[in-house]
């Protein structure tokens, strides 16, 4: 099975359609199995989709199937698709085509699966199609075409955390499905439905299992993380015999007590986001906010059906930084939205210059089938979108370099992700995996992934940091 890896430097958001590590898990590929009932798996899209893939893979292993990273050895291939933007749809259809050509027996699931007719039109030979988070339906179809093998569950035990496609030291924790917002450029509610929050006790149980298994960083994800619990109507859940309010602040507070890094993604700018900042200042959760703002022109924001008071957003950013000076803010924006004028775009650049955001990603508007935005105003030409994209990134590169430079000379905790012949590569609290920068510790080849080390930052650019390990005894002397 050929696995293409999306370059995180090219796109800087977790929503990026990308083939993930379906073949990178050696534990799966090399899992002992005498059944011969082998399932191939291709996972595309964002971390929310990755979590869905992990759940399906876990159930496959529980049922006794072997998961293989080879088309040739697979009795059937599952493709978990993304359908967020047209580029993702194209990539998903290409992945289905490849699976059909290389294997012939394919089940399609995921976001694009909600558009069965579109898939059937291109690939009529697909065996079955299900929509997103249709775990039981996927397993039912697998059982139909590849009978559930007889196996002894005690000889192939599954970890309590289930199958994970991420490195062992970090994991994504999905706390809800769906979204109640109706942004005109987005079709997620049509694909995944309205907000459906997991019970707080279930979320915390999973988080506890992850930490007990050695996970050192929990990345909290959903379509609308800050809306967690809104659909519960204020009802309280229970965990470890104690009541837990079902809202994002209460959940984050409990997660922060587990001893792992807790990083929040996809924070919609609701007023109660203010309540999260003190938790960051206290060190309970990482001082990191992934808060997609999308634009800064009130007119464009209104057309997007997004919060339109940019002055309030700037005031909030200033307020948050006063409470938590270490706060790192990541955001994403869209340029070339239908009807965007040069004046609208200049407002966006002015906002960047004033807000001084740490990490920023930019998308050129892409038509999404079924999105309201496609027809609300005149579409912007590709040449104009390309020009605005480069001007946007040029402005932000200078700001990002300035924000990263403040870490030079500072001693920080670095979580090691990889080690090669040149040294160790890790991340600080300011860096989410795959989408942000890295911390390079040259020459330290004896470190191992998952280690948390102390290092002093020696150099920075607009993306990354360089550091040297700190001698523990020397640091103790300084602190004394």
Swiss-Prot record:
Residue span(s) of domain MTTase N-terminal: 37-147
Reaction it catalyzes: L-aspartate(89)-[ribosomal protein uS12]-hydrogen + (sulfur carrier)-SH + AH2 + 2 S-adenosyl-L-methionine = 3-methylsulfanyl-L-aspartate(89)-[ribosomal protein uS12]-hydrogen + (sulfur carrier)-H + 5'-deoxyadenosine + L-methionine + A + S-adenosyl-L-homocysteine + 2 H(+)
Location(s) in or outside the cell: Cytoplasm
Sequence positions that bind [4Fe-4S] cluster 1: 46, 82, 111
Residues engaged in binding [4Fe-4S] cluster 2: 179, 183, 186
UniProt keyword Acetylation present: no
A cellular component term, taken from the record's GO annotations: cytosol
Xref: PROSITE patterns: MTTASE_N, MTTASE_RADICAL, RADICAL_SAM, TRAM
Cofactor note: Binds 2 [4Fe-4S] clusters. One cluster is coordinated with 3 cysteines and an exchangeable S-adenosyl-L-methionine.
Any one GO molecular-function label of the UniProt entry: 4 iron, 4 sulfur cluster binding
UniProt KW keywords: 4Fe-4S, Cytoplasm, Iron, Iron-sulfur, Metal-binding, S-adenosyl-L-methionine, Transferase
EC number(s) given by UniProt: 2.8.4.4
Cofactor: [4Fe-4S] cluster
Gene Ontology BP annotations: tRNA modification
TRAM domain sequence ranges: 405-471
Domain Radical SAM core, first and last residues per copy: 165-402
Xref: SUPFAM superfamilies: Radical SAM enzymes
Family: Belongs to the methylthiotransferase family. RimO subfamily.
Role this protein plays: Catalyzes the methylthiolation of an aspartic acid residue of ribosomal protein uS12.
Name of the featured protein: Ribosomal protein uS12 methylthiotransferase RimO
Organism of origin: Shewanella sp. (strain ANA-3)
Phylogenetic placement of the source organism: Bacteria, Pseudomonadati, Pseudomonadota, Gammaproteobacteria, Alteromonadales
Gene: rimO
């Amino acid at each position: 099975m050929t696995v293409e890896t999306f370059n995180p430097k090219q796109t800087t958001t977790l929503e990026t359609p990308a083939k993930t590590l379906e073949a990178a898990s050696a534990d799966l590929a090399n899992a002992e199995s005498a059944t011969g009932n082998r399932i191939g798996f291709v996972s595309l899209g964002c971390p929310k989709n990755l979590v869905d893939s992990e759940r399906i893979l876990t159930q496959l292993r529980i049922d006794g199937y072997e998961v293989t990273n080879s088309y040739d050895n697979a009795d059937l291939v599952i493709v978990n698709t993304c359908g967020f933007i047209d580029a993702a749809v194209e990539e998903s259809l290409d992945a289905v085509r490849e699976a059909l050509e290389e294997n012939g027996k394919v089940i399609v699931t995921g976001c694009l699966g909600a558009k069965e007719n579109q898939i059937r039109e291109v690939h009529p030979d697909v065996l079955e199609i299900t929509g997103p988070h249709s775990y039981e339906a996927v397993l039912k179809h697998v059982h139909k075409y590849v009978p559930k093998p007889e196996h002894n569950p005690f000889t192939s035990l599954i970890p309590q955390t289930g199958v994970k496609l991420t490195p062992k030291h970090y994991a994504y924790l999905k706390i809800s499905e769906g979204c109640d917002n109706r942004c005109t450029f987005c079709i997620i509610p049509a694909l995944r439905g309205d907000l459906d929050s997991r019970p707080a006790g279930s979320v915390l149980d999973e988080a506890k299992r992850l930490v007990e298994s050695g996970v050192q960083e929990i990345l909290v994800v959903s379509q609308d993380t800050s809306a967690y619990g809104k659909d519960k109507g204020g009802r309280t859940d229970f965990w470890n015999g104690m009541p837990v309010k079902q809202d994002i602040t209460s959940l984050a507070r409990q997660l922060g007590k587990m001893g792992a890094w807790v990083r929040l993604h996809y924070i919609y700018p609701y007023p109660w986001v203010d309540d999260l900042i003190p938790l960051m200042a206290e060190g309970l959760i990482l001082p990191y906010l992934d808060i997609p703002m999308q634009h800064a022109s009130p007119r464009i924001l209104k057309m997007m059906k997004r919060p339109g008071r940019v002055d309030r957003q700037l005031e909030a950013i200033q307020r948050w930084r006063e409470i938590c000076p270490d706060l790192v803010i990541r955001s994403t924006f869209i340029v070339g939205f239908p009807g965007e004028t040069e004046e609208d775009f200049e407002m966006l650049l002015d906002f960047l210059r004033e807000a001084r955001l740490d990490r920023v990603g930019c998308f050129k508007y892409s038509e999404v089938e079924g999105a309201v935005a496609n027809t609300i105003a005149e579409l912007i030409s590709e040449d104009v979108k390309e020009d605005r994209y480069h001007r946007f990134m040029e402005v932000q590169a200078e700001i990002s370099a300035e924000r990263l430079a403040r870490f030079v000379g500072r001693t920080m905790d670095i979580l090691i992700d990889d080690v090669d012949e040149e040294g160790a590569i890790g991340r600080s609290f300011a860096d989410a995996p795959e989408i942000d920068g890295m911390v390079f510790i040259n020459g330290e080849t004896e470190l191992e992934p998952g280690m948390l080390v102390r290092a002093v930052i020696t150099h920075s650019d607009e993306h990354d940091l360089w550091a040297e390990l700190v001698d523990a005894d020397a640091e103790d002397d300084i602190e004394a």
